């Protein structure tokens, strides 16, 4: 099963120009079996996803509610952005990553570092958790991302392999053309958030493309 697990729409993410009504059509056209909607700090309500599937006539298509959470330490230091799956509420974007991990794991969900080694456009460092990926109690990380140069791919794969974490490939799409640019191929069917969390924990990934 091929899923793109990092997509933003303009319903809840002001930085995206993807209309919700077009996201599934474009995902289908890209050959995907499913997607995750990961708005900034906001989890799509289940009823809204059900309505979206009904209106588009795509009830058999997999749409998973996740969110992308920006985290900050108690001192206000940016700690990176993280994809959350399996948590029933919107988390916002103000908590420390340690608290987010505690909350999400308490609900049986998973936390995946989003673009941990995405270089900043100016200066040094990363627009992600960077080397903290070696120590945080995360369940996985993005090993392929449109903004990764080759060095970032190598760093992400090194963390994945040495820590035994799940590695996923995501488009981080903010426009229709980006959907499915990168996707994760799962060994078994992933029909909902619970199955996704289980697959991440067991690293049931066949390939990242």
PLM features: residue spans?
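Two-metal-ion RNase H-like nuclease active-site motif
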Residues: 63-69
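Charged catalytic cores and adjacent phosphate/nucleic-acid-binding surfaces used
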Residues: 1-9, 13, 19-26, 46, ...
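Divalent metal-dependent hydrolysis catalytic cores, especially in the metallo-beta-lactamase
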Residues: 4, 8, 24-44, 64, ...
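Alpha-helical transmembrane segments and their immediate juxtamembrane cytosolic regions
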Residues: 52-56
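Short, well-ordered coil/turn segments that N-cap beta-strands
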Residues: 1, 31-34, 59-63, 107-110, ...
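Short, ordered loop/turn segments at secondary-structure junctions
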Residues: 40, 68, 116, 173
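Aromatic-lined carbohydrate-recognition surfaces of secreted/lumenal glycan-active proteins
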Residues: 110-121
